[in-house]
Amino acid sequence: MTKMAELKGSSFTLSALHLVDGDIKKATDYLKEKVNQAPNFFASAPVVIDITQAGREINFKQLKEDVKDAGMIPVGVSGCKDARMQNEAKSAGFAIMNAARQAKDMPVTVEPTRIIRTPVRSGQQIYAKNCDLVVMNHVSAGAEIIADGCIHVYGNLRGRAIAGASGQHQAQIFCQNIQSELISIAGNYWLSDKIKAEFWGKGVVISLAENNLNIEHLTL
């Protein structure tokens, strides 16, 4: 008999909007700013709203509409332990999501390094599945390079670079000239405005420690 469908467990990296003080407008204005800065990454992307620090009075219907108006798709709330608030969130169409325990890096089958020798142009996406990615040319603004392992760029990096895409926290990004729209390791990301001026246009190494991105100059 042919299967109609299958329901399986899976894992995804989702952005989380932390509602710090319950001020929905302030939070969604911030969200809209980020969407405008990197629309190819954030526009129409799913987002979870963390309400751990938001207090007990939240208009979940307004929250959902304002997040949608900001350009992202609200899929659930986390940090919601109060039964009344959970019911209100569900009534507004939110899923109740619990933070997962810190997962260990999962072993993967390592494939040979993928090497790209030509320029990666705007609109292109390169994905190195289960391996490192080496780009021996420039990555244009509007391009996206993704690797489950590390990323090495021996040219200007102006597009988006996403390393550790399947959750490898040890992944790093090595770049000869960082001018990136977005950099990400294992779901932790910076937009261009987070890259300090002292590193902009320079050779850098970007790594992850305790879920925080670190950047340092690329030196011998």
UniProtKB/Swiss-Prot annotation:
Q: Which Gene3D superfamilies match?
A: 2.160.20.70, 3.30.70.260
Q: What's one GO BP annotation on this UniProt entry?
A: division septum assembly
Origin superkingdom: Bacteria
Functional description taken from the UniProt entry: Cell division inhibitor that blocks the formation of polar Z ring septums. Rapidly oscillates between the poles of the cell to destabilize FtsZ filaments that have formed before they mature into polar Z rings. Prevents FtsZ polymerization.
Source species of the chain = Photobacterium profundum (strain SS9)
Q: Has the keyword Cell cycle been applied to this entry?
A: yes
Q: Which family does it belong to?
A: Belongs to the MinC family.
Disulphide bridges: none
The molecule here is called Probable septum site-determining protein MinC
Q: How does it assemble?
A: Interacts with MinD and FtsZ.
* InterPro entries for the chain: CAP/MinC_C (IPR016098), MinC (IPR013033), MinC_C_sf (IPR036145), MinC_N (IPR007874), Septum_form_inhib_MinC_C (IPR005526)
| HAMAP family, per the entry | MinC (MF_00267)
Q: Which UniProt keywords apply?
A: Cell cycle, Cell division, Septation
Task: Name the NCBIfam families for this protein.
Answer: minC (TIGR01222)
